[in-house]
Regions:
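PRPP-associated nucleotide enzymes
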Residues: 1-172
Length: 172
């Protein structure tokens, strides 16, 4: 079994969660598996091909799990992007569309310096709305986006279309 197959074997589908008709990708078995976590970080780092990264931006909240470990492995700082009102210092905000309404993401205004090389990470790429909002925040701060990477991608939702012009990598 290769690394990708091993990772896939540690993700379980939960039907009708959080609501009927949704199949939730539960990564908690993967998080509890030391070898699986190591494989995720290995594949994400290998895919970068030695590109310099100054900051890893993790999206709330499941992007924090691997984002922090990825930053450590790359020798980069970690920057959390959170929902409105969750960060204690001065922030920049970005509104994005949800299925029924809108939400707001925030980043500390001093989190990324102009010209810093930034890797954006989350666990899953679905519609691309959240990732697109994070791209806008990073660009407003002057960051240079190296890549967006994800543990998995729901291809049928066409999330990559919102991220055109930026390299996107997904393990699964």
């Amino acid at each position: 079994m290769d690394k990708k197959e091993y990772i896939q074997s540690k993700i379980r589908d939960i039907k009708d969660f959080p609501k009927e008709g949704i199949i939730f990708k539960d990564i908690t078995p993967l998080l509890m598996d030391v070898k699986g976590v190591e494989y995720v970080i290995d594949l994400l780092v290998e895919n970068l091909g030695g590109q310099k990264v100054d900051k890893v931006v993790g999206m709330e909240s499941r992007g924090f799990f691997f984002g922090m470990l990825l930053a450590q492995r790359l020798g980069a700082g970690f920057v959390p992007v959170r929902k409105k009102g969750k960060l204690p210092y001065k922030t920049l905000s970005q509104t994005y569309d949800l299925e029924y309404g809108q939400d707001v993401l925030e980043i500390h205004q001093d989190a990324i310096a102009k010209g810093e090389k930034v890797l954006i990470h989350d666990d899953i790429l679905a519609t691309g709305g959240t990732a697109e909002a994070v791209v806008k925040l990073v660009e407003r701060l002057g960051g240079d986006i190296v890549q967006l990477d994800f543990l998995m991608e729901l291809h049928f939702l066409n999330g990559r279309e919102k991220l055109e012009g930026h390299p996107v990598y997904s393990i699964l």
